[in-house]
Swiss-Prot record:
One of its GO terms (cellular component) is cytoplasm. The keyword Cytoplasm applies. The lineage of its organism: Bacteria, Pseudomonadati, Pseudomonadota, Betaproteobacteria, Burkholderiales. An accessory protein needed during the final step in the assembly of 30S ribosomal subunit, possibly for assembly of the head region. Essential for efficient processing of 16S rRNA. May be needed both before and after RbfA during the maturation of 16S rRNA. It has affinity for free ribosomal 30S subunits but not for 70S ribosomes. It comes from Burkholderia ambifaria (strain MC40-6). This is Ribosome maturation factor RimM. The PRC barrel domain binds ribosomal protein uS19. Keywords: Chaperone, Cytoplasm, Ribosome biogenesis, rRNA processing. Its main location: cytoplasm.
Length: 225
């Protein structure tokens, strides 16, 4: 069993949905309205319920309006959502845009893409700092034993004796495999209610079943481990 996961969680980066958020360039050299005036982007109020943040625009690529996106997951490990989706959703501050993607491809550890109507480098530079979202329904299909992190967050975890172990609050990539962060209610040293955490490797030897419909994961793990 494997978690379809997100690249390295080192250097204190926090897991974000299915992915690991990477630092992005915040310098914005022009208003995105300049690009919108060219018919490339549509300002939107409505936002998809299943939108998942998958990257951020960090630079222009070339001279013909392509943008460069630092992805929160490598292509082949969740970042493929950017390559499959033909519609991206962009957000920066209070500004939200919808972009129709004409072409996209990997470039080193980034994804580069051309949005409809973004015709030159200046228009592409105007999009720097936008966070990029893709609808969950546009993610590539996975094998039966693979899961996106975003689909595991919030699932109940029980062991084979039906003892409740907690709820998946996040995922960690240790470079070898994924690890579930499972939160459960506890009592602190002061006698007050608190929340504690157990870490369970997301590998077949421990994870026996993942039932997304029932929102439950069954593991070979004891409460006192």
């Amino acid at each position: 069993m494997s978690g379809h996961d997100s690249g390295n969680a080192k250097r204190g980066r926090a897991s974000f949905g299915a992915f690991v958020r990477k630092p992005v360039e915040r310098d914005v050299v022009a208003s995105a309205g300049e690009a919108a005036e060219q018919g490339s982007l549509e300002a939107v109020q409505a936002w998809p319920d299943d939108a998942v943040e998958v990257g951020a625009v960090v630079d222009a690529y070339g001279l013909k309006g392509w943008i460069k996106v630092a992805t929160h997951a490598d292509a082949g490990r969740g970042g493929d959502a950017l390559l499959d989706a033909r519609r991206w959703w962009l957000e920066r501050g209070g500004e939200r845009l919808s972009a129709r993607i004409l072409q996209s491809k990997t470039h080193g550890d980034t994804v580069v893409a051309h949005a409809a109507g973004v015709s030159d480098r200046d228009a592409a530079l105007a999009l720097r700092g936008f966070r990029v979202f893709v609808r969950r329904e546009d993610f590539p299909e996975l094998a039966a034993d693979e899961f996106y992190w975003v689909d595991l967050i919030g699932l109940e975890v029980v062991n084979e004796q039906s003892v409740a172990l907690g709820t998946v609050s996040g995922m960690i990539d240790n470079g070898v495999h994924s690890i579930m962060r499972v939160e459960y209610p506890a009592v602190g040293k002061d006698g007050q209610p608190t929340t504690d955490e157990r870490l369970i490797p997301f590998v077949g030897v421990y994870v026996k079943t993942v039932d997304q419909a029932a929102r439950r994961i069954v593991v070979d793990w004891e409460a006192d481990y």
